[in-house]
C-alpha cells in the first residue's frame, strides 16, 4: 500500500499546474453543495470522510483519463529515455529502473525491430520480484508486469515478462497504453562483470565489414533499350541497410533510376564505356565498394566481325557480310561498308523504285555459307519470264536483298537506264518493283509445300471417284447381260434338242 501511495503521489506531483487548478475547482464545486445543505455542527465525521473519498476517486479517474489522452509517441520517448523517478534495482544487479503504469510492450512490433523475449519467471508475487528478476538477468532491459484483476486474492500470482530491447546500440521496443499492465525500463551501468563477459566472447561482438558485389561487366550493342545492374548479391554478417550507386566514368547524360533497393536501371546509353560504383553500408556504419563497367558498342558488327550463317532473312552487305533484315534502312549504318543505308537512300515509297550499283570486279569476301539458293532461282525465273531482253542481271548480293525486301513473287519490270549515268568500273540500272501481295508479307517466303498437300488430296479424291464409277459401270453391264432376250437361233436349238 505504501508503494501504491508513493506512485499515486508521484503521479499527482507530475501533473501540470492546470491539472491542479482543475482539481481545486472540482473540490470547490463539491464543497459548495455540502455547505448549502446546512449540515448541523454535530454532523458525524464519517460523512465528511465519505465525501472526501468520493472526491479522491473522481480525481484519480480524471488523472487516468488525462494519462490515456497522452500521445503514444510521448509515452515511447519517456520509456526509452528512462523517464520517471529512477530507483535502484532490488536485489542483485546494478543500475536503476523507471516505472510507467498502464503501459504494455507492443510485442510483435518490438520483435520485428530487433528485440527479443527472454523468459517469463514463475511464482511472482509482486512487481518488485519481477523487477529483481530483470535486474539479475544480464540482457534484460524491460520488465512487463501483468497486474491481477480487482479485487485481487491475498496470494495472487502476477504475470512477469522479461525482454531485451537493446539492438544495434539503441532501444527498439515500442509501447502502448493498456490498463492492468505496468512496464519497468532498466538502465544499466557498465561493470566489471559485463566487461569481462565482453572480453571473454569477442567473436559475438565482432562485426565484419560488408562485401560489395556490383555484378559482372556488361557489353551492349546499339541500338539498346538499356540494362539493369544488380548489386543485391552483396553480403554482410548482420544486414545491409543502404545501397548507393555512383557514376565514375562515362557520359553524365545517362538516365539512372533505382527500381528496387540494390538495383540500378540505365537508359539513354551512348557509345562508350561507363564505370559505376556500388557502395553498401551495414548496420554498424561500415562501408564497402565495388565497380562494374558497361561497354556500349556502336553496332552489332562494330568490332569487325560478320555473321557466319546468312539466310534470306538477312541483308547482304556489299563486302560479303550480312546483318538482320530489320536493321537495314533504319538510319544507322550496320554494315562495315555502310551499304545497308546506301541501298535505301534512293528508295521511293510512292513508286518503290530502287537504284542499285553493280558489284565491283573484285571478288567479295566470303564469311559463311548461304542458304538462299531458292530465292535466287525465283528471282531469275521472274526476270526471264517478264524481261527476256533486259540488261545484264543483278549481282548475287543485290538479288538476295531484292528477294528479302520484296518477296519471291515480286515482278521486276525493266526501265530504261539514265543516260547521264557514268560507266566507270560500274553500271547503274533502275528497276521498278511491283509486288503482287501487300507490303507486309514480303519478309517471309511463300511456303513451297503449301500447294503439294491440296494437290495430293485432289488427286486421291479423283482416283477414288473414278474407281467408284468403273465399279458401277461394271455392275450395270452384268445386269444388262443377264436380262437380254433369247434370239430365234437359240430358240430353234432348244426345240430341236427336245425332240432329239
Curated annotation (Swiss-Prot):
Subcellular location: Membrane
Domain MANSC as annotated: residue spans: 99-184
Keyword Aminoacyl-tRNA synthetase set for record: no
All copies of domain LDL-receptor class A, residue ranges: 309-345
GO BP: multicellular organismal response to stress; response to cold; response to heat; response to immobilization stress; response to mechanical stimulus; response to starvation; response to water deprivation
SUPFAM superfamilies with a match to the protein in the record: LDL receptor-like module (SSF57424), PKD domain (SSF49299)
Protein topology in the membrane: Single-pass type I membrane protein
Glycosylation: residue positions: 164, 291, 401
GO MF term set: phosphoprotein binding
Cytoplasmic side: 474-500
Residue numbers of Phosphoserine PTMs: 491
Signal peptide (UniProt feature, chain positions): 1-37
Disordered as annotated region, ranges: 358-445
Recorded family membership: Belongs to the LDLR family.
Protein name from the UniProt record: Low-density lipoprotein receptor-related protein 11
Annotated source species: Homo sapiens
UniProt lineage: Eukaryota, Metazoa, Chordata, Craniata, Vertebrata
Name of the coding gene: LRP11
Amino acid at each position: 500500500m505504501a508503494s501504491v501511495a508513493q506512485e499515486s503521489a508521484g503521479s499527482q506531483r507530475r501533473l501540470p499546474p492546470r491539472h491542479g487548478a482543475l482539481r481545486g475547482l472540482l473540490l470547490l464545486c463539491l464543497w459548495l453543495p455540502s455547505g448549502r445543505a446546512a449540515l448541523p455542527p454535530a454532523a458525524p465525521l464519517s460523512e465528511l470522510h465519505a465525501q472526501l473519498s468520493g472526491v479522491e476517486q473522481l480525481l484519480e479517474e480524471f488523472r487516468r483519463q488525462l494519462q490515456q489522452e497522452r500521445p503514444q509517441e510521448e509515452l515511447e520517448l519517456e520509456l526509452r529515455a528512462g523517464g520517471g523517478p529512477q530507483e535502484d534495482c532490488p536485489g542483485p544487479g546494478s543500475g536503476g529502473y523507471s516505472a510507467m503504469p498502464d503501459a504494455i510492450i507492443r510485442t510483435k512490433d518490438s520483435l520485428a525491430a530487433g528485440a527479443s523475449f527472454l523468459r517469463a519467471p514463475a511464482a511472482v508475487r509482486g512487481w518488485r520480484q519481477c523487477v529483481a528478476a530483470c535486474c539479475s538477468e544480464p540482457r534484460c532491459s524491460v520488465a512487463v508486469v501483468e497486474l491481477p484483476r480487482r479485487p485481487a486474492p491475498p496470494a495472487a500470482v502476477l504475470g512477469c515478462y522479461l525482454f531485451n530491447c537493446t539492438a544495434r546500440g539503441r532501444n527498439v521496443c515500442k509501447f502502448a497504453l493498456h490498463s492492468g499492465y505496468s512496464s519497468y525500463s532498466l538502465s544499466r551501468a557498465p561493470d566489471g562483470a559485463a566487461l569481462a563477459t565482453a572480453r571473454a566472447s569477442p567473436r559475438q561482438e565482432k562485426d565484419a565489414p560488408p562485401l560489395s558485389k556490383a555484378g559482372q561487366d556488361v557489353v551492349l550493342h546499339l541500338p539498346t533499350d538499356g540494362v539493369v545492374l544488380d548489386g543485391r548479391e552483396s553480403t554482410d554478417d548482420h544486414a545491409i541497410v543502404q545501397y548507393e550507386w555512383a557514376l565514375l566514368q562515362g557520359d553524365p547524360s545517362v538516365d539512372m533510376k533505382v527500381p528496387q533497393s540494390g538495383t540500378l536501371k540505365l537508359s539513354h546509353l551512348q557509345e562508350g564505356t561507363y564505370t559505376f560504383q556500388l557502395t553498401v553500408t551495414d548496420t554498424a556504419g561500415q562501408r564497402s565498394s565495388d565497380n562494374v563497367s558497361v561497354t556500349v558498342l556502336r553496332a552489332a558488327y562494330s568490332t569487325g566481325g560478320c555473321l557466319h550463317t546468312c539466310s534470306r532473312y538477312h541483308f547482304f552487305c556489299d563486302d560479303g557480310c550480312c546483318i538482320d533484315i530489320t536493321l537495314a534502312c533504319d538510319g544507322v549504318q550496320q554494315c562495315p561498308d555502310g551499304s545497308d543505308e546506301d541501298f535505301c537512300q534512293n528508295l521511293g515509297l510512292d513508286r518503290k523504285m530502287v537504284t542499285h550499283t553493280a558489284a565491283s570486279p573484285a571478288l567479295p569476301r566470303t564469311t559463311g555459307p548461304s542458304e538462299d539458293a531458292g530465292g535466287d532461282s525465283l528471282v531469275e525465273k521472274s526476270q526471264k519470264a517478264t524481261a527476256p531482253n533486259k540488261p545484264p542481271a543483278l549481282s548475287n548480293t543485290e538479288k538476295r536483298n531484292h528477294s528479302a525486301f520484296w518477296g519471291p513473287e515480286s515482278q521486276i519490270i525493266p526501265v530504261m537506264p539514265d543516260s547521264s549515268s557514268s560507266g566507270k568500273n560500274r553500271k547503274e540500272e533502275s528497276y521498278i518493283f511491283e509486288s503482287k501481295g501487300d507490303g507486309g508479307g514480303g519478309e517471309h517466303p511463300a511456303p513451297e509445300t503449301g500447294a503439294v498437300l491440296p494437290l495430293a488430296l485432289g488427286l486421291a479424291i479423283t482416283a477414288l471417284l473414278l474407281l467408284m464409277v468403273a465399279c458401277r459401270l461394271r455392275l450395270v453391264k452384268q445386269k444388262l447381260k443377264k436380262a437380254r432376250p433369247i434370239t430365234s437361233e437359240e430358240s430353234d436349238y432348244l426345240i430341236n434338242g427336245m425332240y432329239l
